[in-house]
Design a protein with these regions (language model features):
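Short, solvent-exposed loop/turn segments at secondary-structure junctions
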Residues: 2-4, 42-44, 84-86, 110-112, ...
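Acidic, metal-coordinating catalytic cores used for nucleic-acid/nucleotide bond scission
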Residues: 55-56, 79-90, 109-114, 139
Length: 187
C-alpha cells in the first residue's frame, strides 16, 4: 500500500456525545508518507508487513528477502499483487529467476478485490489510520506496526463468500469492458 499519509488535523476534533457524532476538521497538515509492503498468509490470516520510506524496486526486493526468511524451505510462495511497475523491475525479475519458489500472479487493472490482502488494508485503514492524528511519519508507522502486532496475536483468515463461477464471470466481464475501452490490452 503506497503513499499512506501521515495527517495531522489543524484543530482537535470534538468527541462523540449523546445525540452527536464525533467530529474532525476537514483540513489537515500532511507530514509525509510511508509505503507498506504486506503479505497475507492465507490459511492462518497472519500478515507480514514492513513500512518503507519509498516504493521502489529496492524496497520491494528487501521485502521479498524478508518473506524468504519468514517462510524457509522450498515450498512455493504464491504472491498476488497489482501491476505496479516496482513489481516488474528487471532487478526484481532477476531475483525471482534465482528464487523460483516465488510465483507472482498479477491481478487485472481495477480488480484489487481479487487480492485478499486488500481486505486487510481496509481493516488497517478503518482501525488504525483513518481517524488517526499523526504528527510524523514515525507516528504513522508506529500505529501500523502496533496494528500488525495486535492482528497477528489472533489472526483471522479472510474467507471468500463468492463462488468460483461468480468470480470467473466478474473477470470475464472486466476483460470485455477493458477490451471495449482499449482493444488488445488483455491479451
Amino acid at each position: 500500500k503506497s503513499q499512506i499519509q501521515a495527517l495531522d488535523r489543524t484543530q482537535p476534533g470534538l468527541p462523540m456525545k449523546k445525540g452527536r457524532c464525533g467530529t474532525m476538521t476537514h483540513d489537515y497538515k500532511r507530514n509525509g508518507t510511508t509505503t507498506l509492503f504486506a503479505a497475507l498468509e492465507m490459511l492462518q490470516g497472519k500478515v507480514i508487513g514492513q513500512c518503507y520510506q519509498r516504493h521502489r524496486h529496492q524496497e520491494f526486493l528487501r521485502f521479498l528477502r524478508t518473506l524468504d526468511t519468514e517462510f524457509p524451505g522450498k515450498v512455493p510462495l504464491h504472491l498476488i499483487m497489482d501491476n505496479y511497475g516496482t513489481h516488474k523491475h528487471e532487478n526484481v525479475r532477476a531475483w525471482l529467476t534465482r528464487h523460483p519458489r516465488f510465483v507472482l500472479h498479477f491481478v487485472p487493472t481495477s480488480s484489487s478485490w481479487l487480492n485478499m490482502v486488500e481486505r486487510w488494508f481496509g481493516q488497517l485503514d478503518d482501525k488504525a489510520i483513518r481517524r488517526g492524528v499523526f504528527r510524523s511519519v514515525e507516528d504513522l508507522e508506529a500505529s501500523i506496526d502496533a496494528f500488525l502486532i495486535t492482528w497477528n496475536k489472533d489472526p483471522k483468515p479472510f474467507v471468500w463468500t463468492a463462488t468460483v463461477d461468480s468470480i470467473v464471470e466478474k473477470l470475464a466481464r472486466c476483460r470485455r469492458t477493458l477490451e471495449k475501452i482499449q482493444p488488445g490490452c488483455t491479451s
